[in-house]
A protein has these predicted regions:
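Glycine/proline-rich loop-helix segments at beta-alpha junctions forming the active-site rim
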Residues: 98-219
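Short amphipathic alpha-helices and their capping/turn segments at secondary-structure boundaries
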Residues: 35-42, 62-82, 115-123
Length: 219
């Protein structure tokens, strides 16, 4: 079980309130990552929280393509810090190994995952949902390793959307009143799009979709 500092009263990150102090930087175990928090440049806009699907091997010292793009877009829009949490904490980049772990492992959330989502949402200036079509045949150009598991596609879609709704409800309860919830875009299946496959024309915050009040129950 990860240990963390007590945040006390919810306080938005600002120039003089370091993200490291509030979130105690990244939290990882060999198989799970619950939160990755990175300082960017001093700015008035504060912390951008991004909710992905599941964590890669990236950490505070090593980027991956998704983290590089998130960092670039967050800096472009004037955020002072970037924090990344995920719907699921299972940490793996190999489709073969992810498939071996099983759909149940992948689609299980809650617990420690939700604790870190709550903590980050309570101090974020803005939140972006960016998990992609997690229950469908592919993620962008990559085959979804869970598409051919024994669980039916319909059942996976129901559970995946249920987890999305669960997280959105959690964020709405915990976020600052003035904070907005965005998606870079919505896919055809009405899931928030994954940043890795999106054009730079969506880089500006002005082009993000405000989904603060969006109903994800029905897609």
């Amino acid at each position: 079980m990860c240990r963390h500092k007590n945040l006390g009263n919810s306080t938005m990150i600002s120039n003089d309130f370091e993200c490291e102090d509030q979130l105690n930087m990244h939290r990882a175990t060999p198989c799970h990552r619950y939160l990755l928090a990175l300082p960017l440049k001093p700015s008035h806009r504060g912390l951008l929280l991004v909710v992905g699907c599941n964590p890669s091997t990236a950490d505070a010292n090593a980027d991956d393509p998704t983290l590089v793009k998130l960092r670039t877009w967050a800096t472009f829009n004037g955020y002072s810090h970037l924090a990344v949490v995920n719907m699921f904490s299972y940490r793996e980049t190999s489709p073969r190994k992810m498939k071996a772990a099983g759909t149940m492992t992948f689609l299980e959330g809650g617990g420690e995952v939700d604790v870190w989502i709550e903590r980050a949402a309570s101090i974020a200036s803005d939140i972006v949902l960016a998990m992609g079509d997690i229950a469908f045949k592919s993620w962008g150009n990559f085959r979804n390793p869970f598409h051919s598991t024994t669980e039916s596609g319909k059942n996976r879609r129901i559970r995946a959307r249920s987890r999305l709704v669960e997280i959105v409800d959690l964020i709405r309860r915990e976020k600052q009143k003035e904070s907005k919830i965005f998606a870079f875009c919505l896919t055809k299946a009405a899931f928030p799009g994954h940043i890795l496959y999106l054009p730079n024309s969506l880089k500006s915050r002005d082009n993000w979709l405000d989904v603060t009040e969006h109903n994800f129950d029905t897609g």
